[in-house]
Amino acid sequence: MYIVTTSFCKIQLQMFTIVSDAAETIKKLFVVFNDLVDIANLSFTNEGLSVQSMDTSHVSLVNLKIGKSYFKDYSIAQEATVGIKISNFVRILDCVGNDEITISFTYDNPDELIVKSEYSDFKMKTIDIETEEMEIPEMDIDVLIDADSNIIQKYLKNMAGFGDTVKIYTQDDVVHMKTAGEIGEVDLQIHDQRVEIKGRLTCEFATRYLMTFAKAAGISKRVVIKLLDDQPGIFEYVFDAESDSKISFFLAPKVKDDGDDEEY
């Protein structure tokens, strides 16, 4: 009787345990997160892991969804939300390397997230973050671009040397990306990619944010860009379609104030 009771209690103390054999991808995802936000809640649910956070300027929102089937093992005794400092998590993932990793959280140590690899054990302090996950509604779009993520990243790298604002606009059934600065300007046509134009579009975004989003090209071969005049742009990278796992970025467009200076 004593042995049965002890075993039962041990099971109950484990809130969740997940195992991933794709540590490199997990690290790349959180490296991109780290470029935008400092802290975030990890939400472990019966459907999978989700992470959502907004940058301190409230200009961009990052939304990560990893379906449970993406993991080698995904065991949830109770759904939980754990707040972490992203840079600390990335530091641990750097130490783990590309090995299989196990992430767990227990009732008796609610202030620690446990990360294990074959030869290393880490305990990371958790933090309390008072925020609720936002529901993101479906929206109409003027332009949809389904493109090779490396091509889009190349476009943005070329444009980053010219200006700090990228203008995306439609003209004669073609989508253009344009920027200008002290040394001149560049206007690129998006070609040889799947493009759907449903309405006229002119919007401007900060180059530095787009460059950060484009780092997700190391995770997904494709990027889907959804644009609507005067609305946040959506940049979506699906890295595992079978489990519906993806990282999405939402970016507020730049607007003109009365003095014709660009601002958010």
From Swiss-Prot:
DNA-binding interval(s): 75-94
SUPFAM superfamilies: DNA clamp
GO biological process: leading strand elongation; mismatch repair; regulation of DNA replication; translesion synthesis
PROSITE patterns assigned to the protein according to its UniProt record, in alphabetical order: PCNA_1
Alphabetic keyword roster: DNA replication, DNA-binding
One matching Pfam family: PCNA_N
Domain of life, source organism: Viruses
Gene3D superfamilies registered for this protein in UniProt: 3.70.10.10
Gene Ontology molecular function terms on file: DNA binding; DNA polymerase processivity factor activity
Keyword Coiled coil attached: no
Similarity comment: family membership: Belongs to the PCNA family.
Stated role: Sliding clamp subunit. Responsible for tethering the catalytic subunit of DNA polymerase to DNA during high-speed replication.
Protein name, UniProt field: Probable DNA polymerase sliding clamp 2
